[in-house]
């Protein structure tokens, strides 16, 4: 928790009443709202080979930004930069107008939640795995988060319920069940920024619908970035970024992009392979 000194100043960075605060490298404390911007970003995993070229985009709280494109187009790389897993070669990434380089990495990543296909679960109970999103969460908060994520139903059917032990990265659960727990973890954390990597086609249709509903529930009011694998799920995005060879070649809403009859139109009508 953030603690007050005798003079009333705040000393640590943590969640305050649902808001996230950062201590900058300058020592200044700021609250994160979730305005994320890329300004002419250039990036390569090795300096000799650039994989993202002049990427510019912005996302505000309450907006959903979807990235679509073939394998290797740069979708995952952009989300890795949102997390600052890597530093960029040129350009700037800002959060609420603050250069990402001025934000401590631990503070930044605590302000983000990721729901990815290959969910990482820990050895421990299901409750512990959900609580990882908020370490001081009560049992009631954990169950409420699971309900939001549509995970409570399958958890409650397990013999030990929320006390069920998970081993070996949750291998006793299906891939869909693991992802529902990851959504519950994000729901309990209530971060300002979410990164969602859609479920793969290997998940059964019923679980896929539960995952989509859970994701929709945790998106509200947050800045959301989606790595899209099926275009049917991004139609309601505020903006869709079509990537090809590390460049944004088209951007706009679903209807706007269909009207352009460009690459998105080709993807949507099955003329070009998305994966």
Tell what function each PLM region has.
Residues 2-275:
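ABC-type nucleotide-binding domain
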